[in-house]
């Protein structure tokens, strides 16, 4: 029950790890420990990095400083074509690079073509095999300049890329292509979309690919990186021996204007009208030139200021919503990289119906307020403290950085000459800059950004009559923004002086149980609540809290479902007690405190964490959240208005409408599974929200809470009895029982073909099985191997051999609670005329697996990675990790069983014991007597319209 809460509480701050690395730089003398870099006479740059953290494995990368932007008008799409061809025949791998990798159980490889560059990677290569690692170097060497580009490979990849083009087709690509001219001001970036046009993909010639490859894939535009558990000296010798064979020929100099985007003084304007637009909205986009080789202090400040902006600026919209003054359904703003040397600030808004112009004025008013007044010292300093704590936590983390992090540092060094520095030194440099910053610094930076230069305004709608904000209306609003300044203002926030200003009667601990294995205690309170407490000084001044109960949607009677849905959506949207959300946000500033509620299908939960110094604030806030939850009538009315608006404007044509029909076919509407339509939303009763909240959170006796961290027992008892013990609770009420939420149709077989308008000729196929048989641990493992085996076989046959699809997805799910259930689904896209053939092959390959007609190599390729992962999970666990102990306490709360960290980590390997017979048996078991679904969505054929590509 606690699993989702635990994940929220104790997740590794990877965003911090990624963010705090890449724009922080240090002097050249602080080069990373374990790094060897150099440059060969032919111009190839190399990086070898071993910091000792990636034991037993290495990652191999090629970075090619050529992307779609380098293509001329007769080459658009060829950079991406080359990426595909790279996994086919090369000088030293005539049977294909992909075949070689997969034959050696190397299944984690990738390539990415962007507008500015192309990247290749082979991951998790075992370093104990010296010959295999040398062969990885030869693969990189061939990618540099040894791809064969054979006619048969070109035609194979042409078919696959056309399927990829169709796979990506849809309103999102139409939107991206349509707005590119205003976002990029008609520069080269506006016309280079990486994949190219369908016409060009059908017609390009082998010689064109060769010419592009020979021209641009040269050592002076490439670097390789080997990162992991490798010997620096030996690897460097091997690199020199292998890569000296590359031709010593330079790629032509790149005209700096290729990547230049000209300024536009006046705003650019575009209306994007498409019947598949999901909601009427508008966006304001502003482009900035941010040089990658700017002075170090400028780069560090840009990075830190961007993090501040992306955290604090969106809160202005939240404050308007909290004050009930918003003219929008949704609004957001962000600052992020656009293309090389450019950033973009994006303001996007979905207005309430009939309030389009007011919403625009409000967005511009918020923008002007940030420009003219900036952030307050209070909000800046609170965020500064959080950012500082985050950086310090990252410095203390083990395994600082990942191979991909290191690759990005090498990229900066290669492109801009920025010294590659030790991760910890870089973060320390960031901290030095952060502590010196004041609110005036970021406000001056914002004022310099929020000009009217390089703007683009775009409206999005289904029809020309919708969202009809003209260019003149936008420009008029932009000029009149000072007059609309009050639209960005919220009412003065009255500070909270004492969160709980009334007496509460503390509870008592009426029973205490020693949990010896867990070294914890279980307290039963007089209101029936149970609290499992563990002292963990390794939490270093923090504590973690989680509470859960059987509940969620599964306990809601059909007649109350609408009220429940609304209550769930409006949790914490109207504040608590006598405080609104803006007051609470102000009160929370500077407090190292997090608290959230969750309502899942089968459970109700609460969770959070805080510094021990803020423990009283945390538990006082928890008490109000659980006992004084507010539901505002005005917030409720806007929720109903917003829901009805979104329902009325839902897509009624195209793929979205078809998907809605499919859902109703597979999961028919019933009282327990109602359609969320106009009648549903109009049936919601405002008074029902409080009743539903009380039903789920109003009886503390239904909950078991866990409290773990650096908080002494006496203090923990004081907090628990005062705040949790004072909650309403009645242990005499029976524990709640869930009902399975299975709304699938009872029909054993459903086969249906739908048709819809489509401009890409792409058909969708979904084949699935659903069964309700119990699986042992071994059978569950066999199911995972079966899924991987199927996906591999479908990839080999449907994509590589038959060229019927770009990708095939196979999913398998097994759940044991509240009832046993397993499902298997296969999803792919193909052209209309290939539907029958693709379906036939899907069933044929599945039948082959059930009959054990697959090779031992295919079995091992699917099983071995899972077996290796299983061995890795058996590594010793960190007994100081709060998430480990929360998980163990959760096991006890749910089962009554006490497990030690050693016992929880101990497990008998399963995957390595599996046989091909086990895979065939489980495939047969889950599909025999299962409910089967075969859903096909085909494009409509119009006379004279070509659909078979």
Feature map (PLM): residue ranges:
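Proteolytic maturation boundary segments
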Residues: 30-45, 231-299, 303, 310, ...
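Hydrophobic, small-residue-rich alpha-helical packing segments that form membrane-like cores
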Residues: 158-166, 171-208, 212-221, 227, ...
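M16 family metallopeptidases and their MPP-like homologs
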Residues: 49, 54-71, 77-81, 96-142, ...
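Peptidyl-prolyl cis-trans isomerase
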Residues: 146-154, 437-441, 445, 630-636, ...
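N-terminal secretory signal peptides that target proteins for export/translocation
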Residues: 1-9
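Flexible, low-complexity linker/tail segments at the boundary of structured domains
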Residues: 217, 697-698
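Bacterial N-terminal signal peptides
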Residues: 13-24
